[in-house]
Amino acid sequence: MPRTVPIQDLRNIGIVAHIDAGKTTTTERILYYTGKTYKIGEVHEGAATMDWMPQEKERGITITAATTACYWAGKQINIIDTPGHVDFSVEVVRSMRVLDGIIFIFSAVEGVQPQSEANWRWADKFNVARIAFINKLDRLGADFYRVYDEIVKKLTIKPVAIQIPIGTEDNFVGVVDLMNMNAIIWLEETLGAKYEIRDIPEEYKAKAQEWREKMVESIAETDDTLMEKYLEGQEISTDELKQALRKATINKQLVPVLCGSSFKNKGVQPLLDAVVDYLPSPLDVPSVVGINPKTVQEETRLPEDDQPFCAYIFKVVSDPYAGQLSYFRVFSGKVQAGSYVLNSTKDKKERVGRLLLMHANTREDITEVAAGEIAAAVGVDAATGDTICDEKSPIILEKLEFPEPVISMAIEPKTKKDQEKLSQVLNKFMKEDPTFKASMDPETGQTLIHGMGELHLEIMVDRMKREYNIEVNVGKPQVAYKEAIKGKAVAEGKFIRQTGGRGQYGHVVIEVEPLERGSGFVFENAIVGGVIPKEFIPPVEEGIKEAMENGVLAGYPVVDVKVKLFDGSYHEVDSSEIAFKIAGSMAFKEAAKKASVVLLEPIMEVEVETPDDYVGDVIGDLNSRRGKIMGMENKGIITSIKAHVPLSEMFGYATNLRSLTQGRGTFIMKFSHYSEAPQSITEKVVGERTHT
């Protein structure tokens, strides 16, 4: 199926917002008015087309970035619907890698909310053009002008209103179009499908003129020719304004602001017009740059069909019918169903089975995908962030860096049968979601799952049950403590067993001393004169290592220690490898007791970003968690705080930070080092271990 829509007529857009700002509702209206659906799906009825996972329908929030194609004014709009909940912001980030433009939706009541601020920063990072839609103008407490001011104060890039509302709350009926200086009034009885263009109501004329003036001035400031005309008082045509605004939007100089109420079906068609008029096509954005794995040189790929094929996989999902679906955006060239491609990230050849154009969770088979287009492939073994390309012209696009999981919990399958299925399912989840990890705790033997927040892990456990029929018990995670010695000590281990026939004899003398944190284990053989034959030396080391696995204080592994074997004796007949192994183990346990053992706890490097208003509260809270503030940096209205905090004090922190900062703080956490635990913590941990 060759290209049906020229590349300049494509718009790859995302719809991004804080949870509950009306994002999925707006998407539903777009699909309705572009003729993709025949009935409007309401989120609160659990019927929205784009929210297709059972968990989404129940919770009324969007978890997976569903993608769909629709058509408006002769242009194809590929929409990626993204979640607003902070636990799922990874979906937003990976979608941005493949978008050319974004509609940011703000609630006219709540204004610029934390997740929107965070997502706006991501859009800055990925250099994505955007338009803003102030939604929910029908709601009690709605105020377009207050929210517009918040956008000015809280976000980068200057907003420019191209509409203002007519009426508010229950009296909201339409908008003033500042480009054409007329009123658009929606007809209730047609579900907003029809509207009338009227003259601006008398009482809005002065306000409309004032905001039109602001708009023209803002646009003229971005274009020298228009600025001259403006200063000389010449008339600037609507076409000139639109062209200049398109250019300024694509260059991230301005953000056009529109308004409406998606739920009441008002404002959606002009929003679609704005997507077509102001957001870029794949030709308007910088060409993609990657690394050639053979030459390790940077290469640029132009968004043209005759360039070598290269695409970026931004999402992987397991489909109950089709198997693994890999969503991808083609940056150059084209790919046919049934052809072979190179997964350059893994250096592995793959066959593209089927190619699908997606509409939420229904699909249409296609034969070819070309530059600028978004589709899903069946049969490609890939993970999120992989590049697929023409094997003759390999290229690797930048891999996304995802935040490390910040919360873990132990899970245990309820039946033996589920145990076998569980590891396959966990592997599938890890491929789909780079912020989800699963591991086995070698010390406790528990399976641990790690994610971005409690809701994230809840939903994963829920999916195990719904999609794969695996039931698990969920527990609290354990902290992986370690033990270390503080001083030097000498001890001997003697294992002598005399029974009928051949006996057992092993005798060693060792010295232990502490090493620097992170040094691990050093074994020194200082035996001279053959007091212990050399074939018995490795078993001694093995016995010591085994004893180190279960420390003498609370049974945690002993680390950072040097052991010197310097004396001992053997018996011509009775000595054996096993006897020396046991002697080595006995000697180490004895020496460790003498060398005063301490408990080590894992210390995490925590970086918190918070609006300035909450810095005091955040620091106070970190101090109360035995945190040590390592540094602070002011980034405009946000302050970044770095601290070292024991892992045991960080459970529940995500929820706590949210309430401390009204949801506006974010944090990342990674392992830093092990450090000696205070006496009170040691006593508590030892007490818990000896009672279990």
From Swiss-Prot:
Its main location: cytoplasm. Residues 8-283 form the tr-type G domain. The keyword Hydrolase does not apply. It comes from the Bacteria. GO terms for biological process: ribosome disassembly. Keywords: Cytoplasm, Elongation factor, GTP-binding, Nucleotide-binding, Protein biosynthesis. It is found in: Cytoplasm. CDD domains: EF-G, EFG_III, EFG_mtEFG1_IV, EFG_mtEFG_C, EFG_mtEFG_II. One of its GO terms (molecular function) is translation elongation factor activity. GO terms for cellular component: cytoplasm. GTP binds at residues 17-24, 81-85, 135-138. InterPro entries: EF-G-like_DII (IPR053905), EFG_II (IPR041095), EFG_III (IPR009022), EFG_III/V (IPR035647), EFG_IV (IPR047872), EFG_V (IPR035649), EFG_V-like (IPR000640), G_TR_CS (IPR031157). Catalyzes the GTP-dependent ribosomal translocation step during translation elongation. During this step, the ribosome changes from the pre-translocational (PRE) to the post-translocational (POST) state as the newly formed A-site-bound peptidyl-tRNA and P-site-bound deacylated tRNA move to the P and E sites, respectively. Catalyzes the coordinated movement of the two tRNA molecules, the mRNA and conformational changes in the ribosome. Belongs to the TRAFAC class translation factor GTPase superfamily. Classic translation factor GTPase family. EF-G/EF-2 subfamily. This is Elongation factor G. It comes from Hydrogenobaculum sp. (strain Y04AAS1).
